[in-house]
């Protein structure tokens, strides 16, 4: 069984193999959290990592709720403000189901 931090490590490694550069992990604010902050070319990428050992109750991609998307967007906006970044960004999801990794670019 993979737990949260192990899933994030696996997702980070997968994204680095795809050419992204790691910036920061587990950025927390009172109103939201960003699992991974990465860079890809000139884009800053805010990544939500979801893990499910089985899909019988819904897959990892379906586990991202509208409320969670709102919190991630708010956290990313705050991150860009406090770091004084005026750069293009996107939101990706890495869904790990069992031993399969699915990377959804520009997910929301």
From Swiss-Prot:
SUPFAM superfamilies recorded: Restriction endonuclease-like
Gene3D superfamilies in the record: 3.40.1350.10
Coiled coil, from the record: none
GO molecular function, one term: nucleic acid binding
One Pfam family, short name: UPF0102
Family: Belongs to the UPF0102 family.
HAMAP family: UPF0102 (MF_00048)
Protein name per the record: UPF0102 protein Sputw3181_3835
């Amino acid at each position: 069984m993979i737990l949260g931090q192990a899933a994030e490590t696996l997702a980070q490694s997968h994204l680095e193999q795809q050419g992204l550069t790691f910036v920061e992990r587990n950025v927390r604010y009172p109103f939201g959290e960003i699992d991974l902050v990465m860079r890809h070319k000139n884009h800053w990428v805010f990544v939500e990592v979801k893990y499910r050992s089985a899909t019988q109750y819904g897959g990892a991609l379906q586990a991202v709720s509208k409320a969670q998307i709102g919190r991630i967007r708010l956290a990313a906006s705050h991150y860009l403000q406090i770091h004084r970044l005026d750069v293009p960004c996107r939101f990706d999801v890495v869904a790990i189901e069992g031993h399969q990794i699915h990377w959804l670019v520009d997910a929301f």
